């Protein structure tokens, strides 16, 4: 990992990272919204507090490293260098959703996975995934109001039930993700759950044929969830150590699958699942060989902006996807300046 020691170069790196996060490598620009990245980040800070020099959301995390190798079939759908068939180095970060660094690993909230693929010629491709098949809101405004709704009341220390109810009524698209989390206990390990890209993207191949896709990583170790008894007995912190021990035993792997969209499938709404009969294609395998606590490790300084893409992969106009880049850049700028 390259460490930036000179202060001037550090500021330059922050500025460049913010620029890249804003435009990506294959971005179509920001969608017009009624909220700004600064408002959303301020809302997150107001709800969870500020942990100086750390991420504002998905703050509790674990680093891992490994590689990705594409299948030969992947090139049929995308000309991205990710699908060259060569071994692509990967820096991964597993996390719990939210801004509480002491959140228990038994919490019924999403688990996140950030992936940075280190492509040839000093280029990168990022992915930001959750272990829920759909997202909770369809707009930046919905995300902003959700963060405000779950803010603890100063008197009770818990979210105001009336505000939560009002949010759910205003944004009924939240029901699908909420139902998934309520009916599925957390995974036994970061290695025992699928991770979904949530948004739709465009794959472009060598003949400029474009296909709408969604993607997910399916664990070769299988899906395993805590039983109710295990959930009650589990310690507050177990996910990191289990992942470290699992990678020490042998490499842990996920198969990378794309789902091919058809006309009429939701292109710009991550709260709507595509029909289950859509064709799926395996396009590669992610292998992680080592995991470690986050402080000082490779993933700590990475901004996993999902709009940092490559030739052959383009974003859609999904307003949530388009909005994330600005919030990620602002959060990255703050934490790397020790704020």
Curated annotation (Swiss-Prot):
Do the record's keywords include Protein biosynthesis? no
Q: Name one Pfam family in it.
A: Catalase
* Entry-linked InterPro entries: Catalase, Catalase_core, Catalase_sf, Catalase_SrpA-type_pred
Coarse class of the primary localization is: periplasm
Localization: Periplasm
Q: Please indicate which superkingdom the organism of origin belongs to.
A: Bacteria
Cofactor(s) for this protein? heme
Q: Where is the signal peptide?
A: 1-31
Record keywords = Heme, Iron, Metal-binding, Oxidoreductase, Periplasm, Peroxidase, Plasmid, Signal, Stress response
The Gene Ontology terms for molecular function here are: catalase activity; heme binding; iron ion binding; peroxidase activity
GO CC terms, sorted = cytoplasm; periplasmic space
Q: What induces it?
A: By sulfur deprivation.
Q: What does the record give as EC number?
A: 1.11.1.-
Q: How does a null allele present?
A: No significant differences in the growth kinetics of cells grown in medium containing high or low concentrations of sulfate.
Q: Which GO terms describe its biological process?
A: hydrogen peroxide catabolic process; hydrogen peroxide metabolic process; response to hydrogen peroxide
Binding residues annotated for heme, in chain numbering: 328
Identify the catalytic residues.
58
Record's family? Belongs to the catalase family.
Task performed by this protein: Has an organic peroxide-dependent peroxidase activity.
Cited PANTHER family: CATALASE
Name of this chain's protein: Catalase-related peroxidase
Lineage here is: Bacteria, Bacillati, Cyanobacteriota, Cyanophyceae, Synechococcales
